[in-house]
Design a protein with these regions (language model features):
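Glycine-aromatic micro-motifs
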Residues: 1-131
Length: 131
């Protein structure tokens, strides 16, 4: 892990597919999403692309972020890429086990859990309740 950052003017949400609903981000003025940033090799990136279903399910977007070093706390501007689910995918309700996994990550990085809660509330409001 290189460090953590915040993607400004983006919001967090759960969008779906036939296999479930997963996290993604979308432009949203005034919002922000905390993120962890990893150093990846070309081989790592290729493996991540396959895992994330890129470019069919998610696509990659380049961003320049201010990253707070995990060891030093020093802020450095770096070019990064993020995976974003294609916009035509519908809002969906995630499984409880997926939300727990995401929450574990949020806790381990010290992120405010309200970002996940808000995304989950939006999913329930827009997609309806799970049967």
């Amino acid at each position: 892990v290189m460090g953590t950052s915040v993607i400004k003017d983006y919001g967090l949400l759960f969008k779906g597919s036939l296999t479930g609903a997963y996290l993604t981000i979308e432009p949203k003025k005034g919002s922000e999403v905390p993120v962890a940033v990893w150093i990846v090799t070309e081989t790592d990136e290729e493996a991540l692309d396959r895992y994330e279903g890129c470019p069919v399910f998610y696509y990659k977007k380049d961003m320049e972020l201010d990253i707070k070093g995990i060891r030093t706390g020093k802020i450095r501007k770096r070019k990064c890429f993020v995976y974003i689910m294609h916009e035509e995918r519908k809002i969906g309700i995630p499984s409880l086990s997926y939300v727990r996994t995401c929450l574990d990550g949020y806790i381990s990085f010290g992120f405010d859990e309200h970002y996940l809660s808000e995304a989950q509330i939006r999913a329930v409001k827009e997609a309806g309740y799970e049967d």
